[in-house]
Amino acid sequence: MTERTLILIKPDGVERGLIGEIIARIERKGLKISALDLRVADRETAEKHYAEHADKPFFGELVNFITSAPLIAGVVEGPRAIEAWRQLAGGTDPVAKATPGTIRGDFALEVSTNVVHGSDSPESAEREISIWFPNL
């Protein structure tokens, strides 16, 4: 069964020139990129994306960071795409949970600037894709 997931290469990943490396890892894994867009996220999109964290103390920091500079938003498809992308990305905490060989394990040091985002469930994927790519 083909599954879709949203991926973001966050502003820190774009600024550090990691787009090509990350896209290459996606393609080597066998996933298909069905949408890709370089953009600066507006505040409304960021707040919708992070709505589940709206009551947490770090919400403002998340929104400010994701809207601070260009990012890549994309949709990736394939069998078990959500799990496959999360495996490529590595744990949210790049030092404590992301193993070497993952994107975060190789390229990040802080939770707040951990290079990439990926949906964590089919429901989240559909919600997030509709926020970033409403016409898909």
Curated annotation (Swiss-Prot):
Presence of keyword Repeat: no
Residues forming the catalytic site: H117 (pros-phosphohistidine intermediate)
Pfam families xrefs: NDK
GO molecular function ontology, one term from the record: metal ion binding
Organism: Corynebacterium diphtheriae (strain ATCC 700971 / NCTC 13129 / Biotype gravis)
Record bears the keyword Zinc: no
This protein's UniProt keywords: ATP-binding, Cytoplasm, Kinase, Magnesium, Metal-binding, Nucleotide metabolism, Nucleotide-binding, Phosphoprotein, Transferase
Subcellular location(s) per record: Cytoplasm
Name assigned to this protein: Nucleoside diphosphate kinase
SUPFAM superfamilies from the UniProt entry: Nucleoside diphosphate kinase, NDK
Name of the gene: ndk
PANTHER family referenced in this protein's UniProt entry, alphabetically: NUCLEOSIDE DIPHOSPHATE KINASE
Residues the record lists as binding ATP: K10, F58, R86, T92, R104, N114
